[in-house]
């Protein structure tokens, strides 16, 4: 007897940036007739303006499509669109857990890239059936046969009969759909067991509250049921369930095992629907949650302060709204003597940080200034206490610190042969430890390094691209903490420490860094009527200094000839005045000076 599930296929599309994932999704949506031609637009699933502009997918999306296969049966497809970027690896892994299969899109002109690898390994960990598809075969520079061989060599997937498609021209898309029906297994699961549903994303809707995007593994969920989140124990009453059509929510009576859809239960914040959590029936709960849930910890921190005509309250409101849709964003109020009141924010990684900053500026029209990004250090004090420090100003004094550890990542870099030297040199400059090197065919190399996250946070990505003329691709994962010789560098202006400019740096690099900063500040701080010393120090030892010279009035202008003692008297008087001014004068540090130094940090 055929079960209802036998006609369901849950799958996602994995690809490196720009290999044509969203375009393929567009074609599949078009072919299955989910949208009329009038509603069709490019990158249907990328709803955020930034997603379209950068050509990246940030939030996971899911759509239900109906497909009449060549065997005459009608199938239900659930296409779950995943983010492709390293910062969102956890979201990707949850989206993959909601599927039984994945389509691996590889660009016929580029071959395999670092992020493709990272996501494929994730898919293999979840035991997904992977269908390799070679895209962009309409381009003159396409080399499908080499790419097939590459897929076999590097990933070990049989790609001999991989569909050759062009998502842009719509060539061979049917073949992909038939392969989905043929190769991807239908969902397992039993709708008579207690409810188990995996949350793989959540979205805040102004009318319905938080919508949890779920994949139902066992059981049934329908309105008026009481559901329970297994990680927090919070309970809610379901108000509506349904599934997704592109850009629309379609309410339905129930979601059964194997279905992908949404649950609305008048939940107030996204915090309550944690990605990766299991939803179960409060009256008949499941014994244990689905595996793989973990709490997201921010890896990169920076301060965000309002500037110009932006008010603190506006910034707070904007961050709260962003947080509704972005459970990984963390922020707490912070004040700095130099920048006033603002927030300390935590992010999953660099791209996440950039996107949040960009959304604040674009969607909420705010003027903000961000301090240099820092990572979370683990500090062991001499009395044995262990602290996690994300803000250099909170570091205990040097005499109380027993050891400092910094987060390390495993970086995988794929690079063409001719740039290997340059890239290895870059990794060494960034205190990387060489681990492994392997060749793909004869033209490309996979390098594996262990590196401090701190070195990647600044501008590793840009440096990598510029030294490899844009050909290298890169992926990283956190592996743990390692002890390191770190110091806190303070910048003193006229003898006072400026908190916004303090940062933690490796001892070997402290001097160059300090030199650069004091020189930059000297250019940026306007001259006052007294001289201003700018010093960079570690503890009480000054390691670099510049002085902004004083402006002086020409007091001798009115003495034409005259006696030298008269001139001396006037000069002495001026000197006295300057000395007094220096004691009581305040230094105005313009906002531009901060910006310049923080940019130089990069």
Swiss-Prot record:
Catalyzed reactions: GTP + H2O = GDP + phosphate + H(+)
Residue positions binding GTP: 18-23, 135-138
MF-aspect GO terms: GTP binding; GTPase activity; ribosome binding; translation elongation factor activity
Keywords: Cell membrane, GTP-binding, Hydrolase, Membrane, Nucleotide-binding, Protein biosynthesis
GO cellular component terms, semicolon-separated: plasma membrane
SUPFAM superfamilies: EF-G C-terminal domain-like, P-loop containing nucleoside triphosphate hydrolases, Translation proteins
Membrane topology: Peripheral membrane protein
PANTHER family associated with the record: TRANSLATION FACTOR GUF1 HOMOLOG, CHLOROPLASTIC, TRANSLATION FACTOR GUF1-RELATED
Family in the record: Belongs to the TRAFAC class translation factor GTPase superfamily. Classic translation factor GTPase family. LepA subfamily.
Name listed for the protein in its UniProt record: Elongation factor 4
Native source organism of the sequence: Caldicellulosiruptor saccharolyticus (strain ATCC 43494 / DSM 8903 / Tp8T 6331)
Classification of source organism: Bacteria, Bacillati, Bacillota, Bacillota incertae sedis, Caldicellulosiruptorales
């Amino acid at each position: 007897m055929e079960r209802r599930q036998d006609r369901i296929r849950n799958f996602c599309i994995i690809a490196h940036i720009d290999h044509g994932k969203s375009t393929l999704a567009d074609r599949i949506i078009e072919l299955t007739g989910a949208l009329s031609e009038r509603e069709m637009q490019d990158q249907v699933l990328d709803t955020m303006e930034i997603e379209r502009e950068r050509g990246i997918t940030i939030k996971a999306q899911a759509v239900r499509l109906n497909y009449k296969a060549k065997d005459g049966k009608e199938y239900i497809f659930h296409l779950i669109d995943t983010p492709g970027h390293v910062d969102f690896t956890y979201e990707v892994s949850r989206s993959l857990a909601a599927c039984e299969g994945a389509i691996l899109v590889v660009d016929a002109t580029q071959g395999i890239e670092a992020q493709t690898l990272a996501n494929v390994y994730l898919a293999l960990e979840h035991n997904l059936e992977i269908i390799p598809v070679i895209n962009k075969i309409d381009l003159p520079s396409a080399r499908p046969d080499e790419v097939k061989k590459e897929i076999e060599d590097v990933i070990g997937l049989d790609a001999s009969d991989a569909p050759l498609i062009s998502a842009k021209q719509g060539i061979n898309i049917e073949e992909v759909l038939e392969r989905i029906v043929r190769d991807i297994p239908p969902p397992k699961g039993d709708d008579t067991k207690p409810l188990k549903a995996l949350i793989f994303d959540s979205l805040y809707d102004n009318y319905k509250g938080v919508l949890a995007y779920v994949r139902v593994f066992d059981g049934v969920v329908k309105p008026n049921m009481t559901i329970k989140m297994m990680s927090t124990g919070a309970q809610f009453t379901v108000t509506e369930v349904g599934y997704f059509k592109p850009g629309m929510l379609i309410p339905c009576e129930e979601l059964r095992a194997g279905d992908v859809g949404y649950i609305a239960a008048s939940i107030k914040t996204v915090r309550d629907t944690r990605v990766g959590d299991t939803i179960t029936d409060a009256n008949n709960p499941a014994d244990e949650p689905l595996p793989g849930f973990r709490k997201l910890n921010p890896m990169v921190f920076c301060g965000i302060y309002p500037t110009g005509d932006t008010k603190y309250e506006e910034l707070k409101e904007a961050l709260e709204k962003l947080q509704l849709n972005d459970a990984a964003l963390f922020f707490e109020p912070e004040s700095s003597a130099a920048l006033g009141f603002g927030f300390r924010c935590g992010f999953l990684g660099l791209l996440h940080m950039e996107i949040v900053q960009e959304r604040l500026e674009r969607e909420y029209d705010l003027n903000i200034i961000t301090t240099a990004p820092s990572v979370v250090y683990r500090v062991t004090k001499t009395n044995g206490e262990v602290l996690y420090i994300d803000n250099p100003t909170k570091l205990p004094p040097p005499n109380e610190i027993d050891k400092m550890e910094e987060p390390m990542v495993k970086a995988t870099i794929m690079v063409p042969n001719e740039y290997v030297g340059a890239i290895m040199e870059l990794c060494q400059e960034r205190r990387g430890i060489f681990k492994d090197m392997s060749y793909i065919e004869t033209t490309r190399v996979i390098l594996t390094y262990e590196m401090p996250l701190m070195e990647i946070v600044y501008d590793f990505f840009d440096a990598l691209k510029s030294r490899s003329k844009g050909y290298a691709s890169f992926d990283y994962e956190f592996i743990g903490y390692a002890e390191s010789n770190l110091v806190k560098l303070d910048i003193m202006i006229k003898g006072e420490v400026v908190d916004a400019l303090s940062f933690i740096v490796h001892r070997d690099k402290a001097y160059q860094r300090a030199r650069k900063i004091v020189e930059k500040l000297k250019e940026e701080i306007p001259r006052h009527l007294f001289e201003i010393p700018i010093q960079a120090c570690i503890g009480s030892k000054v390691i670099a200094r510049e002085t902004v010279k004083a402006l002086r009035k020409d007091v001798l202008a009115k003495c034409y000839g005259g006696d030298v003692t008269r001139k001396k008297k006037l000069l002495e008087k001026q000197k006295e005045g300057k000395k007094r001014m220096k004691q009581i004068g305040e230094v105005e540090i313009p906002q531009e000076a901060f910006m310049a130094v923080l940019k130089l940090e990069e």
